[in-house]
Amino acid sequence: MSNQYQEEGCSERPECKSKSPTLLSSYCIDSILGRRSPCKMRLLGAAQSLPAPLTSRADPEKAVQGSPKSSSAPFEAELHLPPKLRRLYGPGGGRLLQGAAAAAAAAAAAAAAAATATAGPRGEAPPPPPPTARPGERPDGAGAAAAAAAAAAAAWDTLKISQAPQVSISRSKSYRENGAPFVPPPPALDELGGPGGVTHPEERLGVAGGPGSAPAAGGGTGTEDDEEELLEDEEDEDEEEELLEDDEEELLEDDARALLKEPRRCPVAATGAVAAAAAAAVATEGGELSPKEELLLHPEDAEGKDGEDSVCLSAGSDSEEGLLKRKQRRYRTTFTSYQLEELERAFQKTHYPDVFTREELAMRLDLTEARVQVWFQNRRAKWRKREKAGAQTHPPGLPFPGPLSATHPLSPYLDASPFPPHHPALDSAWTAAAAAAAAAFPSLPPPPGSASLPPSGAPLGLSTFLGAAVFRHPAFISPAFGRLFSTMAPLTSASTAAALLRQPTPAVEGAVASGALADPATAAADRRASSIAALRLKAKEHAAQLTQLNILPGTSTGKEVC
């Protein structure tokens, strides 16, 4: 800031001298930009009341208004302008006013739209036009340059750092990651004097406009020493922009496609400059796409969409880091046999475990609670599917309707096969005895006071076998059935139970008749005294009898039960 403007601002607000010179006190900015602004005074037709330094500055400014952005010596006539005011009021700086400025704005906007629609990936974008929007009006995305310029033309009193559009790519991080010899420039102050969190308007225009845009203002070849000192950082940035054109184009297109591809899942709303940059990058894209760009453009073709882990790049994020996040996906969980056994055991207890049960299972099985929950959801769906399929394909002749025929413990021993396989649920001797008694029951006269079975051909429910009092209470058990239970009680082998079940009816009647005179007390004593070895011997004898008689499935007692 030159001394004459500091004196001019401090004459009205004397307390501004106590402020830090590097932070550009808000009082000085208010007096320079707000009250003594040549723009506002010329807009009001009060140019005759300008002080001498500002009036002397107005004529060179009018002379330089129409000059292009990349002219060789844009600031030769107004070397007294400090760099901050030069950014604001110089050519391409975003504060050109009236007359030629408005015409240049319309022409440049039309040129920007045409070039954006027709240019190739390396097409030259037009110089950014001056703002034609009213103060505070947001750009509508007609072009990246117009968007950034209009954002820079916010109202004097309401211009804040938070209103400036975010830069679409973090320049220093992306250059550093791409291996470019990048020396970060000193943090430039923005219009309000804050440390350079948001770059000045020329840099915003250069970044948003893409690599094909013209060099930013101040990149001229002026030979004056003071001009080179004032614009040294801007020239460095322009040279880097030309050298790293390919990297910046690739990163801009990556970020633009990420913003356009996933607008719904993006938590950060794209600002005007970023949206315009995205539109320009996609519109100017021509020819073949590299494999990396095709992967970015159609990520679902390569990896499938995963709603949990899809990541949207925000406007200020680093594009390479976001690309790595987008490539991650959750693979299918592979369960070990032990984990599956434990999960199945828990599923047998309850189909809907609570959160504590799920967490306990997860800790015990070294899984996450979410994986356990998803497993139970899938298992319930599979169970419902099997249940529905079993109910639809159930033949009418089976004793148990629907899925009960597949899940009931006694179902393998009630079908037509002569020697059914071992069923793990048949580990209770009482259940085996009840099955044998039910198999022998139709061939014997029912004992007095006992419940009668349904007629032949009617399906037998679970309560018929296990819930009827005839199999539970000793008072309803005749001596013949007591003897049968005494021989069946200690059985643990399914083959023995199957052999007794498939035994022909005369053999069962003979076995029952041999103990017909025994009372229930004697039956209980025999049940306690009998040994497993004797029962195994009897089972072998029964198997031998079955082999000798050559029993066919049609004459088995399983058919008689039905």
UniProtKB/Swiss-Prot annotation:
Residues 328-387 bind DNA. Residues 124-133 have a biased composition (Pro residues). Residues 160-172 have a biased composition (Polar residues). Its main location: nucleus. Residues 141-155 have a biased composition (Low complexity). Residues 223-253 have a biased composition (Acidic residues). Gene3D superfamilies: Homeodomain-like (1.10.10.60). Changing P353R: In LISX2; abolishes transcriptional activation of KDM5C; abolishes sequence-specific DNA-binding; reduces transcriptional repression of LMO1 and SHOX2. It is found in: Nucleus. One of its GO terms (cellular component) is nucleus. Changing R379 to L/S: Abolishes sequence-specific DNA-binding; reduces transcriptional repression of LMO1 and SHOX2. Abolishes transcriptional activation of KDM5C. Residues 207-222 have a biased composition (Gly residues). Changing R332P: In LISX2; abolishes transcriptional activation of KDM5C; abolishes sequence-specific DNA-binding; reduces transcriptional repression of LMO1 and SHOX2. A motif (OAR) lies at residues 530-543. Pfam families: Homeodomain (PF00046), OAR (PF03826). Keywords: Developmental protein, Differentiation, Disease variant, DNA-binding, Epilepsy, Homeobox, Intellectual disability, Lissencephaly, Neurogenesis, Nucleus, Transcription, Transcription regulation. The keyword Transcription applies. Expressed predominantly in fetal and adult brain and skeletal muscle. Expression is specific to the telencephalon and ventral thalamus. There is an absence of expression in the cerebellum throughout development and also in adult. It comes from the Eukaryota. Residues 1-21, 50-81, 118-255 are annotated as: Disordered. GO terms for molecular function: chromatin binding; DNA-binding transcription activator activity, RNA polymerase II-specific; DNA-binding transcription factor activity, RNA polymerase II-specific; DNA-binding transcription repressor activity, RNA polymerase II-specific; RNA polymerase II cis-regulatory region sequence-specific DNA binding; RNA polymerase II transcription regulatory region sequence-specific DNA binding; sequence-specific double-stranded DNA binding. InterPro entries: HD, Homeobox_CS, Homeodomain-like_sf, OAR_dom, Paired_Homeobox_TFs. One of its GO terms (biological process) is cell proliferation in forebrain. Belongs to the paired homeobox family. Bicoid subfamily. Transcription factor. Binds to specific sequence motif 5'-TAATTA-3' in regulatory elements of target genes, such as histone demethylase KDM5C. Positively modulates transcription of KDM5C. Activates expression of KDM5C synergistically with histone lysine demethylase PHF8 and perhaps in competition with transcription regulator ZNF711; synergy may be related to enrichment of histone H3K4me3 in regulatory elements. Required for normal brain development. Plays a role in neuronal proliferation, interneuronal migration and differentiation in the embryonic forebrain. This is Homeobox protein ARX. It comes from Homo sapiens (Human).
